[in-house]
Amino acid sequence: MGKYSKAVDKNEKYGIMNVGSDDVALEYQRYGRNKNTLVNSTYIESGEYRRKFDNATDNAEVNKALYDNAKKALRHRSGTAFEDMYWIDSNTGKTILAVEDSKEERAIIYNERIMKTIRNESDIITLHTHPSSMPPSASDLNSCFRNGYKKGFVACHNGRVFGYTANEEINERIYNMYVERFTKDGYDEFGAQMRALNKLSQTYDVSVWEVLHNE
């Protein structure tokens, strides 16, 4: 984890945010073009949405924690650009840490409390929200690798759910280069990001998939 400058610097192109004078790290969602952050509460409460989590992992308690936290976070953050995040024990399904008071748009700042908690825990699975309903970002993947997370999940405001793993660090500039290239080829922001992630998975030991419901 690098040190961050005192100046606040949001760089949309590269998905980097430098915040304050403390040593912080963060999950940062690359800004997409979808500005509708309202959550369809009827769908979030539906059986179809619940079934998405039935096989998210091979642990029923973890799946329940993922579902419960996703619903809570989406209800909480509907209509805003703020994110909530949860750290879950992959063995017991216990939520060991929650951040539900982030004041930074589309970001979770890793403060001392978070870093201390994850240093003392292993086999963590994370869940956080993406207000713009984009897939996992390059910084999500790198945070997963750097912090030794077993797996991560993203609950999008439009009801989509994504899972991801990362066993090595990726070059975020290359990711953004791919996104720009696919955008120029005519794909929308979501499609460009998905294709960029697929391209990276051919070179790096990372994986991203959409979590779908069972029929």
Where are these regions (language model features)?
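Charged, amphipathic alpha-helical segments
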Residues: 56-73, 134-139
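A short catalytic or substrate-binding loop motif that flags glycine-/basic-rich loops and adjacent residues
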Residues: 77-81
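Short HxH-centered metal-ligating active-site micro-motif
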Residues: 12, 22, 100-148, 157
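Short amphipathic beta-strand/extended segments with alternating polar/hydrophobic composition
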Residues: 94-110, 162-168, 176
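Short, solvent-exposed coil/turn segments at beta-strand boundaries
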Residues: 92, 147-150
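Short beta-strand scaffold segments in enzyme catalytic cores
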Residues: 83-91, 153-155
